[in-house]
Amino acid sequence: MTQDDPIARALDGIRDLYAGNLATHGRDSKSVGWKDEASQLVRFDRLARVVDGRDAGCTANDWGCGYGAMFSFLDGRLGDALTGYTGYDISQDMLDAAARSIDSPKARFVLGREVTGEADYTFVSGTFNVKLDTAAADWDRYVKDSLRAIYARSRRGLAFNLLTTYVDWKQDTLFYADPSEFFDFCKRHLSRYVTLVHDYQLYEWTMLVHREPSA
């Protein structure tokens, strides 16, 4: 990406937006754009369903990890079955907040715009929601290219969420995705084993993509 690239410009703006949120709210769900912790936990619960119950141990990548809330959730749910976690983010401020609050040998945090290492599962929560003034078609292409790259580094599965198009109104700076279109994309380009979760109270959906049939 170059500075003339609309995606690069958007990512710079998103980085600054979240750094400002963190300065205002601290290590709180509002800093990463969520209404409250309760709704954040609902999202994490849906995403974590990608983990196969037969797994004796697994590693996780978290792309757009913010201050590391997903690690705390996964560590609490999986315990010793979570053997390693890498959180990626474009905001050094967010990563510093994560490192200050999370003291675990299982967790590490990496600054970057791409996932560079493999893991059993990759989680992407809210990372694609803000597009700022980027054209929707450009952002859609960026999301799908990113999902291809992330899935290539996911040994067992990928879980991500996006804002749904089934809403009463839309905000211009946010990206809304048709769940049926993305289900088709995942089936055609990622895996035969795809689950769309769109039965919870938030204005979004979650996609679970497995390399093998789930338990």
What is the role of each PLM region?
Residues 1-29:
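N-terminal, positively charged/glycine-rich alpha-helical extensions of SAM-dependent methyltransferases
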Residues 38-56, 73:
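Conserved alpha-helix/loop element of class I SAM-dependent methyltransferases that forms part
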Residues 61, 68-110:
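Class I SAM-dependent methyltransferase SAM/SAH-binding core
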Residues 109-118:
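Short acidic low-complexity segments
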Residues 121-140:
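A short SAM/SAH-binding and catalytic strip from SAM-dependent methyltransferases
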Residues 128-130, 163-168:
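Short "lid" loop at the C-terminus of a central beta-strand within the Rossmann-like core
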Residues 154-162:
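Conserved beta-strand signature within the Rossmann-like core of class I S-adenosyl-L-methionine
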Residues 170-215:
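Class I S-adenosyl-L-methionine
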